[in-house]
Amino acid sequence: MSGKIKVTFIINDGEEKTVEAPIGLSILEIAHSNDLDLEGACEGSLACATCHVILEEEFYNKLKKPTEAEEDMLDLAFGLTDTSRLGCQIILTEELDGIKVRLPSATRNIKL
């Protein structure tokens, strides 16, 4: 399915940037293609928590539950909340049209 949805990124100073994003890409990919500061040190391989984002509950509840591997990485995230997810694991669908994604003010990159 091809198409686009609206994604709003809330940057740590409260500024909002709304973009049109292709369905099927991840939040991490959309952030990078729009020059937003979402690190993604492991490039989506579930080996870090630098693409940690915070969602509104409405959209968090539309996603599949995080895998155990994602939960393990989220445990390392700075500023973890009940609606935290990794941006690399959120794949855009039509159902997520209008999603708001808050970028935390800091990330923690743990090098093993």
UniProtKB/Swiss-Prot annotation:
One of its GO terms (biological process) is P450-containing electron transport chain. Keywords: 2Fe-2S, Electron transport, Iron, Iron-sulfur, Metal-binding, Transport. SUPFAM superfamilies: 2Fe-2S ferredoxin-like. Signal peptide: none annotated. It comes from the Bacteria. Residues 5-107 form the 2Fe-2S ferredoxin-type domain. Binds 1 [2Fe-2S] cluster. [2Fe-2S] cluster binds at C42, C48, C51, C88. One of its GO terms (molecular function) is electron transfer activity. PANTHER family: 2FE-2S FERREDOXIN-TYPE DOMAIN-CONTAINING PROTEIN (PTHR23426:SF72), FERREDOXIN/ADRENODOXIN (PTHR23426). Belongs to the adrenodoxin/putidaredoxin family. Ferredoxin are iron-sulfur proteins that transfer electrons in a wide variety of metabolic reactions. This is 2Fe-2S ferredoxin. The gene is fdxB.
